[in-house]
From Swiss-Prot:
Protein's UniProt keywords contain Acyltransferase: no
Subunit structure: Serine/threonine-protein phosphatase 4 (PP4) occurs in different assemblies of the catalytic and one or more regulatory subunits.
A GO molecular-function descriptor: protein phosphatase regulator activity
Biased composition (Acidic residues): 234-244, 256-270, 348-358, 417-426
Protein role: Regulatory subunit of serine/threonine-protein phosphatase 4 (PP4).
Name of the protein: Serine/threonine-protein phosphatase 4 regulatory subunit 2-B
PANTHER family (UniProt xref): PPP4R2-RELATED PROTEIN, SERINE_THREONINE-PROTEIN PHOSPHATASE 4 REGULATORY SUBUNIT 2-B
Extent of Polar residues compositional bias: 182-215
């Protein structure tokens, strides 16, 4: 429908003295009833709308008979003239197009479509005219840019404060100062911008979006590095914990070894055998057993004195046939001594007699270079010198060195007797 013809028809209707219905204006009301689009302002078609409303109510009252039967006691019965005046008064007080204009135009174009009685028809019209909200014609049709809608109602506003937006509804307004958000540009339902003003607002927003993306990417770098550093710190902490566990295990193993050594020392003190010889090399084993009498003398001083007094007489007797005495009895006596001394010995203790025989054979050959052999020979020399002093004649140190067999036999007898005494005491 062309707006120019509509405006000419409205002007002609206003100029007429006698008001008559117009075909062009009736088509205009039918167009509003179908589409709801008001192509012109309220002031332009208000006169024809009031004329058409009054004529329809009169025609309906003339064509439709009065209500038959008794009236409903719950419904107030209002005369036709009073109801008509009330409706016309409300419509004349409008400052804009009511938002129920489409329904009102339907009632004006087809009054008997839903109603048969005059009273019900008037009540339906009254319900649709008793509204407050108003709408205004769209900017696309009448060329007016200062048109806005809020909740389906057209409102006159300033384009500097609001722009038309069709995202959440047919025309939801949006203030222009909200440019911080990247999605603040007004878009239609099809994704296209509404006007050139919105295109201008999109350019700074695009820059802000790129800057925000760049800042986000810049922030992501240190965050990733911090995460890597955190993983490295966690790995270092795990490595330190593993080292601490290993150190603890080593400490526990060392403590266990020390405890075992302490137990072995206690067993050696009880059995009176030097278990320390087991941990030494075989050469040390062959050298240490030469001086069992020295270990016994350090263990008990009283037993040494008794053994010296008792063995002095025997040594004086044994010194004369020492040159012809074989070494077999000495070996036998040492074997019995070791058997008594270590009844629960290991394989190393069983091998000691043979090592002792070899050491006795090496000792008189003049091997006195190592300090261990000297320490082992000193007690035997001291014992032989003490026995010679207690006997009839004094002997020199050269005689004791020249006759090693005599010292060995005497020390063997001395050791045998001194070993028998502690066993008897135990």
């Amino acid at each position: 429908m062309e707006i120019d013809t509509l405006l000419e028809a409205l002007k002609d209707f206003d100029k007429k003295v006698k008001k008559e219905a117009s075909t062009v204006l009736d088509q205009f009301l039918c167009h509003i009833a179908k589409t709801g689009e008001t192509l012109v302002s309220w002031s332009q078609f208000k006169t024809y709308f009031v004329f058409k409303l009054e004529k329809v109510m009169e025609d309906f009252h003339a064509s439709a008979p009065e209500q038959r039967g008794p009236a409903n006691p719950n419904v107030e019965s209002i005369p036709f003239e009073e109801m008509k005046e009330r409706i016309l008064k409300i419509v004349n007080e409008y400052n804009g197009i009511p938002f129920t204009i489409q329904r009102l135009c339907e009632l004006l174009t087809e009054p008997k479509r839903n109603y048969t009685g005059t009273e019900k028809f008037l009540r339906g019209v009254e319900k649709n005219v008793m509204v407050v909200s108003c709408i205004y014609p769209t900017s696309e049709k009448n060329g007016c840019s200062g048109v806005n809608r809020m909740n389906g109602v057209m409102l006159s506003g300033n384009t500097s404060a609001f722009t038309e937006r069709k995202v959440n509804g047919p025309g939801t307004p949006r203030p222009l100062n909200r440019q911080k958000h990247s999605m603040s540009s007004s878009l239609a339902t099809n994704g296209l911008p509404d006007s050139t003003e919105n295109k201008d607002t999109n350019t700074p927003q695009g820059h802000s979006k790129t800057t925000s993306d760049a800042s986000a990417s810049g922030i992501g770098g240190p965050l990733g590095s911090s995460v890597k550093n955190k993983h490295l710190d966690d790995e270092e902490d795990e490595g330190m914990e593993e080292e601490e566990h290993e150190v603890k295990r080593l400490k526990f193993s060392q403590d266990g070894n020390e405890d075992e050594e302490d137990e072995d020392d206690v067993d050696e003190q009880v059995v009176e055998t030097p278990r320390s010889t087991l941990s030494k090399s075989p050469s040390d084993k062959s050298e240490d057993p030469e001086s069992p009498s020295s270990m016994l003398q350090e263990g008990s001083e009283e037993e040494e004195e008794e053994s010296k007094h008792e063995g002095s007489a025997e040594n004086s007797e044994d010194q004369e046939p020492s040159s012809t005495q074989p070494e077999c009895p000495v070996a036998d006596s040492r074997e019995t001594f070791t058997e008594r001394e270590v009844p629960c010995g290991s394989d190393d203790s069983s091998e000691e007699p043979s090592d002792m025989d070899q050491s006795e054979q090496r000792a008189p050959a003049g091997v006195a270079s190592s300090p261990e052999l000297r320490e082992g020979e000193e007690p035997s020399e001291v014992s032989s010198s003490s026995t010679d002093d207690n006997a009839s004649g004094p002997t020199s140190s050269s005689s004791s060195i020249d006759s090693p067999t005599e010292g060995d036999t005497g020390s063997g007898a001395l050791d045998l007797e001194s070993a028998e005494e502690p066993m008897e005491q135990d």
